[in-house]
């Protein structure tokens, strides 16, 4: 199975409700390559669906505290392994939405050994409202989006293991090449539906641009 075929297989399950068999329940101790793992979550597979490693497609089950043998839930995310021959699905109770960061934190006990990319039904974008003071007035920075011809604040997708503020700082650096002073008591967020069960969360901080001659 090629990497593209693997990715297409995993992606086809995002948002679907399926039943999994659990072969490593919460608390299970597993040893691989002389490394011992204690599973803090339930871990199983979709019967009859073969993944990239030639075995049944594996699934992390999140937000279910008790050890189980079987569970029916919604696939809310995918862990793509860039340096391995298999990917993992992420399941939770139906209607649950977790960000890439929240998923990454819960599967870190295994995925810390791999280079991974995480997709989820909840996409989080973080950025900043940037202003400068001129003649006792505030001037706010807006970016013109080339394709939509609309204006927006600088923002971008949160990456695994980033905080919201770290994402906003990175986007300011990447999009407009500045560092700004963050106001400690201002953070606003909003969530809305996109399509096919996906939601988006946008988080904005208030920042002041100081000492940037090009702004």
Which residues fall in each region the model found?
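Unchanged
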Residues: 156-215
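Short, charged/polar surface micro-motifs in flexible loops or helix N-caps
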Residues: 27, 50-53, 65-68, 135-137, ...
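N-terminal strand-loop-strand
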Residues: 119-153
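Thr-Gly-centered strand-to-loop micro-motif
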Residues: 47, 153-155
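A contiguous binding-surface segment within folded domains or other stable secondary-structure elements
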Residues: 38, 148, 159
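Hydrophobic N-terminal alpha-helices or hydrophobic patches in metabolic proteins across all domains
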Residues: 2-121
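Short beta-strand element of the conserved SAM-dependent methyltransferase core
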Residues: 91, 128, 205-209
């Amino acid at each position: 199975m090629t990497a593209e075929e693997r990715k297409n297989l995993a992606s086809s399950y995002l948002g679907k409700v399926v039943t999994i068999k659990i072969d490593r329940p919460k608390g299970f101790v597993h040893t691989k390559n002389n490394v011992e793992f204690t599973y803090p979550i339930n871990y199983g597979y979709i019967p009859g669906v073969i993944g990239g490693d030639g075995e049944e497609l594996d699934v992390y089950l999140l937000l279910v505290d008790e050890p189980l043998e079987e569970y029916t839930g919604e696939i809310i995310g995918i862990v793509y392994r860039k340096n391995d021959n298999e990917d993992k699905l992420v399941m939770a109770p139906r209607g649950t939405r977790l960000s890439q960061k929240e998923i990454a934190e819960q599967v870190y006990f295994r995925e810390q050994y791999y280079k991974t990319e995480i997709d989820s039904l909840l996409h989080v974008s973080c950025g900043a409202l940037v202003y400068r003071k001129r003649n006792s007035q505030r001037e706010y920075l807006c970016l013109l989006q080339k394709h939509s011809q609309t204006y927006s604040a600088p923002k971008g997708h949160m990456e695994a293991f980033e905080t919201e503020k770290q994402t906003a700082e990175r986007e300011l650096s990447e999009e407009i090449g500045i560092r700004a002073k963050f106001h400690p008591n201002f953070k606003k967020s909003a969530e809305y539906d996109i399509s096919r069960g996906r939601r988006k969360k946008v988080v904005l901080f208030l920042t002041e641009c100081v000492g940037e001659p090009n702004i």
